[in-house]
């Protein structure tokens, strides 16, 4: 079985950070990525379960996977083609 979270292009450790810091860090990190690259976000703030999917929708990034059954939460995001 393949772990979709295993080989991201970049990883962002947002453990211990609280809203709005995780999403601010995601935005800053994604800004410096190439289109189509993937970012693994590791977080433990419950607000990320709402904020990261919302950020992806708003900024036209693709949320490829999320694991929010227990902490730390994991999210895999692909930078959108037209997103900045």
UniProtKB/Swiss-Prot annotation:
Biological process annotations from GO: tRNA wobble position uridine thiolation
Keywords, ordered alphabetically: Cytoplasm, tRNA processing
An example Gene Ontology CC term for this record: cytoplasm
GO MF annotation list: sulfur carrier activity
SUPFAM superfamilies cross-referenced by the UniProt entry: SirA-like
Keyword field contains Transferase: no
Principal location class: cytoplasm
Domain of life the protein comes from: Bacteria
Pathway: tRNA modification
Residues forming the catalytic site: 19
Cellular compartments annotated: Cytoplasm
Functional note: Sulfur carrier protein involved in sulfur trafficking in the cell. Part of a sulfur-relay system required for 2-thiolation during synthesis of 2-thiouridine of the modified wobble base 5-methylaminomethyl-2-thiouridine (mnm(5)s(2)U) in tRNA. Interacts with IscS and stimulates its cysteine desulfurase activity. Accepts an activated sulfur from IscS, which is then transferred to TusD, and thus determines the direction of sulfur flow from IscS to 2-thiouridine formation. Also appears to be involved in sulfur transfer for the biosynthesis of molybdopterin.
Entry-linked HAMAP family: Thiourid_synth_A
Family per record: Belongs to the sulfur carrier protein TusA family.
Subunit-level organization: Interacts with IscS.
Protein's UniProt name: Sulfur carrier protein TusA
Gene name as annotated: tusA
């Amino acid at each position: 079985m393949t772990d979709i979270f295993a080989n991201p292009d970049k990883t962002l450790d947002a453990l211990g950070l609280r809203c709005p810091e995780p999403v601010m860090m995601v935005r800053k990190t994604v800004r410096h990525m190439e289109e189509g690259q993937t970012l693994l976000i590791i977080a433990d703030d419950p607000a990320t379960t709402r904020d990261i999917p919302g950020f992806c929708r708003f900024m036209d990034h693709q949320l490829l996977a999320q694991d929010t059954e227990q902490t730390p939460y994991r999210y895999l995001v692909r930078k959108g083609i037209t997103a900045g």
